[in-house]
């Protein structure tokens, strides 16, 4: 299965295409605080071109939908929805926090330490706030939350 995925929820813009037949990943990542709307579509085009596939070869579209600023997540979700409709492909979405927890869960499984299975993902929400969510492995134990750290 060939999966086209992208993220616009943080201070970077990224797109990747997983080529299911070879498990190869073609990706593009650019740090940026703003400008996601201008870079996302060209970035998606770049990864598809570099992969040697055509858009019709994509089997699924994946996108993150926050938490983050309204504009950041709206850009990614709108692009994902447009591509999914235009290509008649299924669309899957995940929170950025759950994607990060998934990556950590893979590392924890290697360690096999039961105490290490609880994962707290915390990211800068700006304005002196933090987005956070608690997981046990890949399972969410809480909803995403916005917290104000105390001094």
Summary of predicted features, one role per range:
Residues 1-65:
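N-terminal beta-alpha supersecondary unit
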Residues 12, 69, 127-129:
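Glycine-rich nucleotide phosphate-binding loop and flanking beta-alpha elements
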Residues 23, 35, 90-151:
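Surface "functional belts" at beta-alpha junctions
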Residues 44, 79-83, 100-104:
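Buried hydrophobic packing segments
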Residues 47-51, 86, 104:
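Stable alpha-helical structural segments in soluble proteins, enriched in small hydrophobic residues
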Residues 53, 85, 111-112:
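Short, charge-rich binding segments
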Residues 62-96:
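DPxDG-like acidic metal-binding loop motif
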